[in-house]
């Protein structure tokens, strides 16, 4: 099975996350996209103390009506810092017959050289680099860390890199939905509308549980 992996804090999940997942699934003919909420991401401080369980529930509600989307609590169960390499290793062991497509933003790909055991990630999965709204993405071969650049071959016409392991790095320009989780948190605290920025089920959950109203 061809499975996309989309990780994040999802604090909260919103329509841009969902659209990215849908576009990657459609363009690369993926059979599933697995959302993986982070327990404690190494490159981002969580806003306030919003628990993994609450963020997990918001993702679950957001994807409930899409049969191609699923959710994993693998990072919540593991605890500690949520390193991508550990998550991908666990998934690879649990589903050895499946092919994974790790979905990340272009800004994250530019910073991948700072990730824990980053070189090993390319041995475990394909990577799908999605351009952020308004961003001008560098060609994939220019964004690679120098230390591993010689392990790749760049196919300019396809905007794709192939790794010595046989995996690929794809570049996809996503639909320009300029929505951010921080914006949603701010609007909620101000008592303003967040309608159409995220699924109605998540909006209702945020209101009922008074999430973000206490500064979280």
Swiss-Prot record:
Sample GO molecular function, one term: nicotinate-nucleotide adenylyltransferase activity
Documented EC number(s): 2.7.7.18
Recorded catalytic activity of this chain's protein: nicotinate beta-D-ribonucleotide + ATP + H(+) = deamido-NAD(+) + diphosphate
Pathway(s) it belongs to: Cofactor biosynthesis; NAD(+) biosynthesis; deamido-NAD(+) from nicotinate D-ribonucleotide: step 1/1
BP term (GO), one: NAD biosynthetic process
Domain of life: Bacteria
Signal peptide per UniProt: none
InterPro entries, sorted: Cyt_trans-like, NadD/NMNAT, Rossmann-like_a/b/a_fold
One Pfam match: CTP_transf_like
Keywords per UniProt: ATP-binding, NAD, Nucleotide-binding, Nucleotidyltransferase, Pyridine nucleotide biosynthesis, Transferase
Function noted in UniProt: Catalyzes the reversible adenylation of nicotinate mononucleotide (NaMN) to nicotinic acid adenine dinucleotide (NaAD).
Family: Belongs to the NadD family.
Protein name: Probable nicotinate-nucleotide adenylyltransferase
Gene name for this UniProt entry: nadD
């Amino acid at each position: 099975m061809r499975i996309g992996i989309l990780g994040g804090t999802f604090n909260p999940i919103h329509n841009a996350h969902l659209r990215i997942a849908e576009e990657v699934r459609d363009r690369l003919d993926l059979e599933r996209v697995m959302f993986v909420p982070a327990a404690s991401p190494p490159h981002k401080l969580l806003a306030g103390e919003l628990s993994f369980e609450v963020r997990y529930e918001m993702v679950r509600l957001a994807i409930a009506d899409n049969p191609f989307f699923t959710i994993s609590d693998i990072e919540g169960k593991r605890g500690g810092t949520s390193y991508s390499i550990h998550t991908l290793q666990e998934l690879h062991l649990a589903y050895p017959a499946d092919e994974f497509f790790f979905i990340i933003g272009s800004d994250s790909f530019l910073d991948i050289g700072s990730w824990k055991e980053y070189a090993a990630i390319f041995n475990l999965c394909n990577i799908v680099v999605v351009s952020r709204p308004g961003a001008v993405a560098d060609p994939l071969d220019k964004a690679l860390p120098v230390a591993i650049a010689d392990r790749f071959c760049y196919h300019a016409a396809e905007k794709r890199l192939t790794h010595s392991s046989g995996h690929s790095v794809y570049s996809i320009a996503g639909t320009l939905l300029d929505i951010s989780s921080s914006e949603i948190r701010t609007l909620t605290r101000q008592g303003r509308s967040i309608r159409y920025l995220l699924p109605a089920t998540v909006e209702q959950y945020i209101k009922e549980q008074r999430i973000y109203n206490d500064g979280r």
